[in-house]
Amino acid sequence: MEDYGLPLVPEAIRRISDSADRKLAWQFFLMFSRFEYALKRQKYVRADRKDAQAAWKSFANDHAVKFSANHDPQLQRAIAYIKQAPPKKQIHENRVLDWAEPKHFSGGPLLPWLLDQVQIIRNNLFHGGKFPQFAVSDPSRDRELIESALVVLGHALRLNHDIEHRFLEGIDL
C-alpha cells in the first residue's frame, strides 16, 4: 500500500489494504456505488429524505416480478448462500455496539429482501462494521457474502435497461 505522504498509516490498515481480498472489495465498492448513481439518475431517490439517497426499496419492488434465478446457476448459488447465512446488522444500545440477529428470508418477493442484504453487506464492509472490537473470526464468510452480493447486483442491474445505461455512462469500455 502506498502511503501517499500520509502520516503513519497503521500497519493493521496496510495489512487489510494489501490483502488478497482488496480487489474483491474494490469491485464491490465500484459496483455498488455505480448502481446507486444509476438509481438516483433514473429518479429512484428517496422522497422522505432531503439528502439524495438511492431508493433501493422502490427499485426492488418495481422489479421484483421480473427477477428470477430459474436459469442461472451462479445466481442460484448466490441467493442460496445469502439465504443460508445472511449478514448480521450492526446495532447499538446505549452506545454499546452489538450485532442484530440476521433477517432471514420469510417469503414474499425475493428481490427486496436480497437488496436489503446487499446494503447490509455494503455497510458492514465500508463502515468498518466487521471490526468493532475484534477481527472477524471467518473472513471467508465475508468473501462469500461479497461475491454473492456482486452476483445479485449484476443480475438486478439487467432488470432495467435505463438503469443499466446510466450505470455504464461515462465509463470507457
Where are these regions (language model features)?
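Amphipathic alpha-helical interface elements
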Residues: 1-117, 166-173
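Charged/polar positions within long, soluble alpha-helices
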Residues: 37-40, 44, 123-131, 154-165
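Amphipathic, Lys/Arg-enriched alpha-helical patches that create a basic surface
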Residues: 141-171
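Short helix/strand-bridging catalytic loops that position acidic/His residues to coordinate divalent metals
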Residues: 14-20, 134-143
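Histidine-centered, metal-coordinating catalytic motifs and their short helical/loop contexts
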Residues: 111-134
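Hydrophobic packing residues in well-ordered alpha-helices of helical domains and bundles
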Residues: 28, 115-118, 139-142, 146
